[in-house]
Amino acid sequence: MDLSGKMVKQVEILSDGIVFYEIFRYRLYLISEMSPVNIQGVDLLEGNWGTVGSVIFFKYTIDGKEKTAKDIVEAIDEETKSVTFKIVEGDLMELYKTFIIIVQVDTKGEHNSVTWTFHYEKLKEDVEEPNTLMNFCIEITKDIETYHLK
């Protein structure tokens, strides 16, 4: 059986899409301020903010449980306003062989959106789809928007 999967979710946002893109590209460290219930820390371990190859460490809480993730920024695309993160260590690696998260911001006039895409390979057949993580990412998106609409 194929253990690979893909999950995509798009969220319409009212705030400026460019601001969202800049946060995910250059200012990830601000997310813990914008979504403190979900994200407790974002630390740069290697490289520079906003550059491919940078290593970032996240401390987060999902379903009341404290978790961690060490990510490498795999790709940045200015044209499509997307940032690709490959998770290399942390709690998700107990369930998945590979896990890649792509955050893409679509800025078309007044209609902006954020699209979260997961590409993953489960370690075992009985591992659940990452719906809880996707809902968590949507919550963070809403928290960032609320912060900017204040």
From Swiss-Prot:
Modified residues (N-acetylmethionine): 1
Keywords per UniProt: Acetylation, Allergen
Entry comment on modification after translation: The N-terminus is blocked.
One GO BP: defense response
Cysteine disulfide partners in this protein: none
Domain of life: Eukaryota
Subunit (UniProt): Monomer.
Annotated family: Belongs to the MLP family.
Record-linked PANTHER family: MLP-LIKE PROTEIN 423 (PTHR31907)
Protein name listed in UniProt: Kirola
Protein source organism: Actinidia deliciosa (Kiwi)
Lineage: Eukaryota, Viridiplantae, Streptophyta, Embryophyta, Tracheophyta
